[in-house]
């Protein structure tokens, strides 16, 4: 079996996920994991699939037809099997909340990068602050630290950024 990661985007409409799932199934594939979202009228998704080695070429050739048939643009990249991609590490959950402003994601991710951390998952959104206080930016992330990175160093780097940005930041073990 070969593992592929698919990225898909298209104008939102009924049947997009069904069309992609059918293409995977028609080639003997298995839908392993996915993250799907609707953002600004666009459907976007990332999907991990496993395919029989001998069916991979036909599957890859079939993907452009999804664009013609349902307006779904799909890219495929060979991945690693589940569980093979991560070495020894620790994982932290990050939650950030503060007044929305440009550069927040850049600042936080730069601090994480400086500590050698990897972002395994990130979800962010904006919402109106209570009593007309403008827009709030909120983010949740799962952060992976390499074996040689100290959690205290990551925490210190993020707390420094949080103070500069004037945001609330929580960092704890997932659970």
Residue ranges and their predicted role:
Residues 1-175:
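A conserved regulatory-domain signal marking ACT and ACT-like small-molecule sensing domains
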